[in-house]
A protein has these predicted regions:
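S-adenosyl-L-methionine
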Residues: 1-187
Length: 187
């Protein structure tokens, strides 16, 4: 989240669960076969084979279907690292593949971004979250911090941003958040 976008690709055959369909993409399939299959075989030593997903090596081990469904109609999502010295939210393309150390929040509006970037949310996270690692870094926990955070009344994540777009509080938060995002992106 704190670095510029990586110049890399992820081969994702989620929409091609059948081996016959996936192997039609010859070069990407060969790459996955050479690298992922061997990696999973090494992981499977001492584990149940279904855990390593050996029989479907071309598929993501955890494809996160709920996240994909929640973000499918969005151009971008709000992302936050699980552990970091500073609490930092950033917009990322919804087509990104999110690792286990990065939380994706299925919202694309500046109001939610602003509320999450606020000092109030940061204080809440410090009180609700825990610490991890040698540097005693804060750990963002979606269940303990995001799900329990008392969003401002009428600006909660279960309400569509368009439904509170006329609210002066939402407009002020969104304007400040948009400026914050612009400054961060241009830094």
């Amino acid at each position: 989240v704190t670095m510029r976008d990586a110049d890399g690709w992820v081969v994702d055959f989620t929409d091609f669960e059948a081996l016959e369909d996936a192997c039609l993409f010859e070069n990407p399939f060969q790459l996955v076969q050479e690298r992922v299959s061997v990696h999973r075989e090494n992981l499977a030593i001492g584990q149940a084979t279904e855990t390593a997903k050996l029989d479907q090596f071309w598929l993501m081990q955890r494809s996160r279907p709920k996240l994909r469904a929640a973000t499918s109609l969005l151009e971008r999502v709000i992302a936050v690292p699980e552990t970091s010295e500073h609490l930092l939210f950033r917009f990322l393309p919804s087509a990104s593949v999110f690792s286990g150390s990065l939380f994706a929040i299925a919202r694309s509006d500046f109001t939610t971004f602003g509320v999450l970037s606020s000092s109030i949310h940061e204080t809440w996270c410090e009180a609700q979250g825990n610490r991890l690692g040698a540097g005693n870094q804060g750990r963002y926990n979606a269940t303990r911090t995001f799900a329990t955070f008392p969003f401002p009344e009428g600006l909660t994540p279960d309400i569509l941003a368009a439904d509170y777009g006329h609210d002066p509080r939402a407009q002020a938060i969104a304007a400040a958040a948009e400026r914050l995002n612009e400054l961060r992106e241009n830094w």
